[in-house]
Amino acid sequence: MRKIRANAIAILTVAWILGTFYYLWQDNRAHAASSGGRGAQRAGRRSEQLREDRTIPLIVTGTPSKGFDEKAYLSAKQLKAGEDPYRQHAFNQLESDKLSPDRPIRDTRHYSCPSVSYSSDLPATSVIITFHNEARSTLLRTVKSVLNRTPANLIQEIILVDDFSSDPEDCLLLTRIPKVKCLRNDRREGLIRSRVRGADVAAATVLTFLDSHCEVNTEWLPPMLQRVKEDHTRVVSPIIDVISLDNFAYLAASADLRGGFDWSLHFKWEQIPLEQKMTRTDPTRPIRTPVIAGGIFVIDKSWFNHLGKYDAQMDIWGGENFELSFRVWMCGGSLEIVPCSRVGHVFRKRHPYNFPEGNALTYIRNTKRTAEVWMDEYKQYYYEARPSAIGKAFGSVATRIEQRKKMNCKSFRWYLENVYPELTVPVKEALPGIIKQGVNCLESQGQNTAGDFLLGMGICRGSAKNPQPAQAWLFSDHLIQQQGKCLAATSTLMSSPGSPVILQMCNPREGKQKWRRKGSFIQHSVSGLCLETKPAQLVTSKCQADAQAQQWQLLPHT
């Protein structure tokens, strides 16, 4: 009896233990499920909160990448203790490696941008990213930002072009991520030829070029695709935000900048001209830009091919953005910066990789090819600004010149007058000449009793070679001057046509005295109004192509 009782107690004890274990296991499953639900609710609340404070939520859309071990991919190339974090990539790799590939970044767009709507049938694009020995953390963050922050139907593929990196797996392992493809060069080709290779195999009708150390912002792609859909000859770029090379902070860039350059073909960011600012009432509207930075832009593939792709005889990197920008404008297209598109970029202070002929010689070769094909007689100013280019080899440009002729592209003079009139043509020793309209010439007419300098038109006396002193003018550095006195508009407002033009003592910093030539017009640089003759005075008026009173001849003393 005791034995039976002992066995019964043992059985009951085991049953109790098993029952307790089963209960706890089931409870744990339910708890995990409910935690997942609450987590989703928290994520939903977090995403709403982040949207309110204009931060992109850290949410990965779609299914996880099958077969891609993100942790293993990143840990294989992390810095060793004591290594210089800047040495290999010219940015702080240690800080980059600390960050999640899916990190949230701030929405830096203008508050009006979220209310802009776009077509529901925007074309899909092939995103082309070229790289050479890029840090795995920045490369992966670039790829994942595109996938996480772009509607899936707009990304046909992401083509990674590995420009002969030391480790092929930097690229190959990423093909385990959906939509990512990898092309590997069997020798170092450089960004330019690598991009052409990526474009040639791209399946989409629209190409999007990205650098390999970027993070795209929310709704970055639809605004650019919309502009290209409306006009396939547009080449569009986002506002390029700054990712700190030191701590990888994401910093908003100004929305009032466009691309510019000097005669040495050195790219610079510059303020939008004042007259354009004054007419911009909608901050979401595109900004015309003379050149693009070149690292990030969207272009129709057929237009890219029609224009001749890139100049494949250019080496590695540098200068290709000028060549493409001149070609787009002069051959019938346009360049825009779209304010509602934002992409962050790590700007480095040095190149982390080697150029076969050195950085300086490579840049000279590339920009010299640009100058010889596209700058016509103005290439002399390139050589004056960059004398080290004189005599340097740059290869044959015969096929590029022939292609320009076949496309019936406009002149560089047209580009300066219609696209980039702010680029001043250098004047070494500006000699006096006359400013003529019909048989009359612009002349100073002494002073009145109040001491004001008088200005008017009079019958031309003498010649351009030997003008009368009152009709001899010097037009240089945006000033129209005579013996220390300069033409000045009395108003710089575009809304004030008919304002008199007077003579006053020259002040190179005075905006009222700034003028530029635009074809046969003399245009006030600030107001955008044109110099016009009236019966009793000279005024600034709205420029009109058929206004004879606004047509001028500037005949230099030669």
UniProtKB/Swiss-Prot annotation:
GO terms for molecular function: carbohydrate binding; metal ion binding; polypeptide N-acetylgalactosaminyltransferase activity. Pathway: Protein modification; protein glycosylation. Mn(2+) binds at residues 211, 213, 345. The keyword Membrane applies. One of its GO terms (biological process) is protein O-linked glycosylation via serine. Pfam families: Glycos_transf_2 (PF00535), Ricin_B_lectin (PF00652). Residues 33-54 are annotated as: Disordered. Keywords: Disulfide bond, Glycosyltransferase, Golgi apparatus, Lectin, Manganese, Membrane, Metal-binding, Signal-anchor, Transferase, Transmembrane, Transmembrane helix. Its EC number is 2.4.1.41. It is found in: Golgi apparatus membrane. GO terms for cellular component: Golgi apparatus; Golgi membrane. Substrate binds at residues 163, 188, 212, 317, 348, 351, 353. The chain crosses the membrane at residues 7-26. Residues 27-558 are lumenal. It is a single-pass type II membrane protein. Residues 122-227 are annotated as: Catalytic subdomain A. It catalyses: L-seryl-[protein] + UDP-N-acetyl-alpha-D-galactosamine = a 3-O-[N-acetyl-alpha-D-galactosaminyl]-L-seryl-[protein] + UDP + H(+); L-threonyl-[protein] + UDP-N-acetyl-alpha-D-galactosamine = a 3-O-[N-acetyl-alpha-D-galactosaminyl]-L-threonyl-[protein] + UDP + H(+). The keyword Protein biosynthesis does not apply. Residues 1-6 are cytoplasmic. InterPro entries: GalNAc-T (IPR045885), Glyco_trans_2-like (IPR001173), Nucleotide-diphossugar_trans (IPR029044), Ricin_B-like_lectins (IPR035992), Ricin_B_lectin (IPR000772). Residues 428-555 form the Ricin B-type lectin domain. Catalyzes the initial reaction in O-linked oligosaccharide biosynthesis, the transfer of an N-acetyl-D-galactosamine residue to a serine or threonine residue on the protein receptor. Belongs to the glycosyltransferase 2 family. GalNAc-T subfamily. There are two conserved domains in the glycosyltransferase region: the N-terminal domain (domain A, also called GT1 motif), which is probably involved in manganese coordination and substrate binding and the C-terminal domain (domain B, also called Gal/GalNAc-T motif), which is probably involved in catalytic reaction and UDP-Gal binding. The ricin B-type lectin domain binds to GalNAc and contributes to the glycopeptide specificity. This is Polypeptide N-acetylgalactosaminyltransferase 16. It comes from Homo sapiens.
